[in-house]
């Protein structure tokens, strides 16, 4: 289970060092074989390969004749790249995905349970500000009776 938010520095080659606490779990789940892809919110998704494969199968089972489905297929599967953690626990983000997400030097790694989101620092702060300034957040019906 991946949780927590960590600020990472991207090097000049586009590599990010994954924190040790997550690195060990990623190696245990997938031997360091990961999938990195684009998300409609202009962040990236990082999945252990075994967790990504059933998601990709579901996405590709959608009708390619439906505009929304085919757009989602192009985004999530079309941008998907196999990446590996190197010996130093780093992953390489391709120039295409760096450009898509607007990555510069600082990147936020945000645990989402089964996977991570990677955000440019600017986009991370903007979406946090948007969430925090919302006067009323509408909850999905499934969460109406939920309390923290």
Swiss-Prot record:
Task: Return the GO cellular component terms, semicolon-separated.
Answer: cytoplasm; nucleoid
User: What's an example GO BP annotation here?
Assistant: negative regulation of DNA-templated transcription initiation
Q: Does the keyword DNA-binding apply?
A: yes
Q: Which GO terms describe its molecular function?
A: DNA-binding transcription factor activity; transcription cis-regulatory region binding
Domain spans labelled SpoVT-AbrB: 5-51, 80-123
SUPFAM superfamilies on file:
AbrB/MazE/MraZ-like
Q: Where in the cell is it found?
A: Cytoplasm, Nucleoid
Pfam families membership: MraZ
What the entry lists under PROSITE patterns is as follows:
SPOVT_ABRB
Keywords on record: Cytoplasm, DNA-binding, Repeat, Transcription, Transcription regulation
The UniProt subunit note reads as follows: Forms oligomers.
> NCBIfam families given for it?
division/cell wall cluster transcriptional repressor MraZ (TIGR00242)
Q: Which family, according to the similarity comment?
A: Belongs to the MraZ family.
Q: What is this protein called?
A: Transcriptional regulator MraZ
**Species assigned in the record:** Methylobacillus flagellatus (strain ATCC 51484 / DSM 6875 / VKM B-1610 / KT)
């Amino acid at each position: 289970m991946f949780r927590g938010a960590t600020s990472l520095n991207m090097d000049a080659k586009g590599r990010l060092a994954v924190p040790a606490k997550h690195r060990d779990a990623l190696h245990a789940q997938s031997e360091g074989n990961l999938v990195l892809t684009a998300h409609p919110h202009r962040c990236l998704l990082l999945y252990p390969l075994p967790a990504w494969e059933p998601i990709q199968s579901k996405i590709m089972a959608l009708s390619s004749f439906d505009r929304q489905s085919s757009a989602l297929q192009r985004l999530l599967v079309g941008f998907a790249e196999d990446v590996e953690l190197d010996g130093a626990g780093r992953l390489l983000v391709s120039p295409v995905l760096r450009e898509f997400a607007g990555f510069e030097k600082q990147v936020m790694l945000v645990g989402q349970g089964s996977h991570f989101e990677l955000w440019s620092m600017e986009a991370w702060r903007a979406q946090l500000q948007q969430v925090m300034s919302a006067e009323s957040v509408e909850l999905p019906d499934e969460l109406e009776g939920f309390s923290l």
